[in-house]
């Protein structure tokens, strides 16, 4: 840290149960789509940094997988471990909860964050959907009783309600530091990682409840040739039947997945994209620690 610096910089963990709006919150704060979203729980599998630099303040957000009770497969253990690890060595923790709904998985997260010694903010999401705001007060009071040292803030990650106030509160808690990243950098993740995540998002939005959790995406080629970015993506599934579902009747579903992913890639990478998708069966990959490591899932 330089002497008499007026700049602030620090890490902010975004935690909560699956499908509560953590990635939507990150995307709205950043002002662009970075983290993938869907209505299905456990869409986020990896911790990912989203970096926002505004004036003298650089907030480095850690978007985490939702903490959940299922721990039966190596992939589930990896996601839970990633989410828990994010609580360490950060400057601020944001605990995202729903405006009224409280689940066993919310309770699981609460039991972890109650040991946080630094600043803790409970972001009560989706409050824009409540016609009678007075109905929210008992829930806010109950949350405050559970975590007396936390600050409770109603927000809407989707609509952006009260996010300016949330960011201002976060900035107050960040330590005085030189900025860790260049002003124009928005993530620590590679373009190949982001491309794979966009394909996986489109699959999750198209398919049924169970199948998406047995699918992962690997980028085999990522090459800029002139004005066109060529991306070859391999979709891994665990059974032949799953491969047929992804391909769809006469290849219609995989064409739709590819078309939607390509549009988002062209916006993200600011380039024309030629996207090719293949589907391959790799039985039991989601419970094979060696396979998970080879697919970029880190330490298990």
UniProtKB/Swiss-Prot annotation:
A GO BP entry: ribosomal small subunit assembly
Q: Where in the cell is it found?
A: Cytoplasm; Cell inner membrane
* Main location (coarse class): cytoplasm
Keywords tagged on the record? Cell inner membrane, Cell membrane, Cytoplasm, GTP-binding, Membrane, Nucleotide-binding, Ribosome biogenesis, RNA-binding, rRNA-binding
Q: Where are the transmembrane segments?
A: none
Membrane-topology annotation of the record: Peripheral membrane protein
Q: Name one GO cellular component term.
A: plasma membrane
Q: Where is this region: G1?
A: 16-23
Q: Which residues form a coiled coil?
A: none
Task: Tell me which residues make up the KH type-2 domain.
Answer: 199-283
What residue stretches are annotated with the Era-type G domain?
8-176
Provide the residue span(s) of the region labelled G4: 125-128
UniProt-annotated stretches for the region G5 = 155-157
A single MF term (Gene Ontology): GTP binding
Q: Where is this region: G3?
A: 63-66
**Residues where GTP binds:** 16-23, 63-67, 125-128
Family designation: Belongs to the TRAFAC class TrmE-Era-EngA-EngB-Septin-like GTPase superfamily. Era GTPase family.
Q: Which PANTHER family match?
A: GTPASE ERA (PTHR42698), GTPASE ERA, MITOCHONDRIAL (PTHR42698:SF1)
How is this protein organized at the quaternary level?
Answer: Monomer.
What exactly does this protein do? An essential GTPase that binds both GDP and GTP, with rapid nucleotide exchange. Plays a role in 16S rRNA processing and 30S ribosomal subunit biogenesis and possibly also in cell cycle regulation and energy metabolism.
HAMAP family hit by this protein: GTPase_Era
What is this protein called in UniProt?
A: GTPase Era
Q: Which organism is it from?
A: Pseudomonas entomophila (strain L48)
Q: Quick one: which gene encodes this?
A: era
